[in-house]
Every structure is written in structure tokens, then in C-alpha cells.
Amino acid sequence: GANWDDFVAFTVELGLEGVEGLSGIPGTVGASVVQNIGAYGQEVATSVESVEVWDRDTKTTRDLTPADLRFGYRYSALKTSMYAGPGRPAGRFFPTPRYVVLSVTFALTHSAEGTVGYGQLAKALGVEVGDRMATADIRKAVLAVRAAKGMLEDPTRYALPDMATAKREANILTDLERLASLNEAAGIPVGDDGLPAPDYNRHSCGSFFMNPILTADQAAALPEDAPKFDATLPD
């Protein structure tokens, strides 16, 4: 499938708002809707209009709406189709979903500005949560924050045979130059060619942790300064 960050970069170049906060996440557009990826105040679910899939059970194509997909916190109906029940793999399709994602239709806003929706990102930009900023600046800040935490994908991995054609060549070069600049600013040496050395700790397929989900009573028992976020759970 299409490289996710290639897609995000393309939307920012076109002056579209909606997924700029999801910059730098490894993986594909198809996988993004299976996991309902989210970061820095945005989730894929808020921008998806429909998903075209191949149903491996009925051998037909289907167009799934957000209601069909039942998006939740790192959750979708596509993801749960791998299971016959809680903790019970569906023998026929596991460890892959019943549905193969063929295409995703996004509904984005024609705007060169986006909303800063996360505290850490707002701090990096020197603004308040809820402020409007250029989507290009939001993307740049997200990538810098990820790099500082060691969570920015190593673009040198695309030189490996198994990764060939997985990302646009022009974007690989842009990513290499960006990471070299960020490394240099952080005092991390770059190669004689001015590009970053391979960092195998950044050969990532993304993070799979989830924040704990608590009842309102359980959350009330936490210290007052413990971060808390409302969660929308699937039925």
C-alpha cells in the first residue's frame, strides 16, 4: 500500500488539513485504518470517509463507512475481524484481518492551517493548545519532537532490498536531509556525505502500546496531576 508519511506530506503540500499531526508514523495508508492510528491530537478516524475492501470470506469488494468500521481507540472492525472473540484468534484469517484494504477515501479540509491539539506539540511550537498554525509548521514540529524521542523512522532502511519501492525516492532524500539536520542540531555526528548513519533502533513498524482504560471511579482515585483523556469505546 501507499506509504503513510508520503500521503501526509502530499496532503500538506496540497494545502489540506486533517492528518498533519500524524506525520512520521511508519506503515501504510491501508494499515492506518485497521489500527486507527493516532498521535499529537489527531486520529485517522476523524478524516476517513470510506474504505474499499476485499472481503476474503464472501469473495467480494465492499465499501465500508465509518459506522461500519466502528472506529475506537486503536480499534476498528477490520482489526477485530482477526478474532473470533476476546483473545480468541479467528483460525481462518488470523493473524491478518478478514478484509484486505484496497483504497481509503479521506475527507480533508482545504486549509493551509491546522489546529494544534496536543500539549507537547504546543510547547514545541510556542503556542497554546487549540491555536491555529500552518500545517507545514505543525508537521515540521511533529517530526522534530519524534526525532528528539528517538521515534522518527530511520530513512536509511529504505536502501534495504526488502524496503525497495515502499516509499517515494524523493521523500526518502527529504527525510534523510531532515534527519541529518536534526541530528546535527542535537550534536549527533553525520557521515562524510552529510547524511545520517543507519540507526537500527529506528527501524520501526510503529508503537503498539495503549494507554490504560479506566472507569470514571478508577480515574477519580488517581492523583490530581495524573494526565487523563476521554476515551470513546466501541460497543
Feature map (PLM): residue ranges:
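Phosphate/pyrophosphate- and phosphate-bearing ligand-binding catalytic cores of soluble enzymes
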Residues: T61-D235
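Anion-binding (especially nucleotide phosphate/pyrophosphate-binding) glycine-rich loop
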Residues: G1-T58, R62, D68
